[in-house]
UniProtKB/Swiss-Prot annotation:
The keyword Glycosyltransferase does not apply. It is a multi-pass membrane protein. This is UPF0756 membrane protein LCABL_15860. Keywords: Cell membrane, Membrane, Transmembrane, Transmembrane helix. GO terms for cellular component: plasma membrane.
Length: 153
């Protein structure tokens, strides 16, 4: 019962905040929760969902390359600018932090609750997007490492 109340609360916040992605995500989880024999699928979604999402995002990012909108000329132009190098650096940093964050979530699943709560606040009230949990977990890992507070170490 507690999980239903929690999900309904998140759904209500998502509706008030008019966040379609969160509304769809919570609604889908609630529908799967209603259907008998979906525990294994929900577990699979929990363990592989982020990877699936990253795959979809990666495919979406590749579309301009596939359609010819972005080619080597654009790549060469962007690496000639400071903004391009900053973007490359940020991409590398986020990739490394995300890898560390996924490791932290594996070591300390209870951290997920705080990250999800923070992500919901950011998504609903600050008009962010829900790509935050992996990046947030990576930042959390770095901060916890600095203060020697990483769970399990």
């Amino acid at each position: 019962m507690e999980s239903w109340l929690f999900l309904l609360g998140i759904l209500a916040i998502a509706i008030v905040g008019k966040n379609k992605s969160l509304i769809i995500g919570v609604s889908a989880v609630m529908v799967f929760k209603l259907i008998p024999q979906t525990q294994n699928f929900l577990k699979l979604l929990q363990t592989q969902g982020i990877n699936w999402g990253v795959t979809v995002i990666s495919a979406a990012i590749m579309v301009p390359i596939a359609t010819g909108e972005i080619g080597f000329k654009e790549l060469l132009n962007v690496i000639k600018s400071p903004a391009g190098w900053i973007a490359i650096g940020c991409g590398v940093l986020v990739a490394v932090l995300s890898a560390k964050g996924v490791g932290l979530l594996a070591m300390s699943p209870e951290m997920t609750v705080a990250l999800v709560f923070g992500t919901i606040i950011g998504v609903v009230f600050l008009k962010g997007i829900a790509a935050g949990p992996v990046i947030a977990s990576g930042l959390t890992y770095v901060i916890l490492t600095v203060f020697n507070l990483v769970p399990g170490h």
